[in-house]
């Protein structure tokens, strides 16, 4: 963080993405997108599930229909397709919690940071599970989901709303993201963005879309953040 000119940085709020950050779930989403879109005559390779991750589902569907069917679709049509994708996703094995993320959050709380989640998902079962799985770690009442914003990632709106709910300013806020569109959204909102590359995309996809720094798991994030904050404390004592 020092190399980004943040010698005096004092983060107060951390906004986590959900899929691919809190849960090791992206492989299931990618498969579900591929299978669901194929039913409607749309080719969506699994890798695109990672590229579009973070965007509201109906927006992803509208883009793919425009590209491959050559027409605009109604909100009802998009929702029908999204519900099919959700049905396939929920028929799969339940995604596990990302290794190291709870340890990272406990550390953040010990350093007086507040935490919530900003996700492009709007599925009630996932949001309910999120509040349950991370009870005591995240501020569940302030979660931002797809239903809370008109423009999803890569627009800054979800993260701007997250900061508003947490009473935080951009210069006090860290965004933790795994997806290019989410990284774009965090940067557009003015936050310091940590990219955690937990999927098959090259690191450059996160760096080129604006991640200030890229790690490969939550243990790396915790170690780096702890070193940085400890160095800050040493300066204060000096």
Residue ranges and their predicted role:
Residues 21, 119-121:
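Conserved phosphate-coupling serine/threonine residues in phosphotransfer and NTP-handling enzymes
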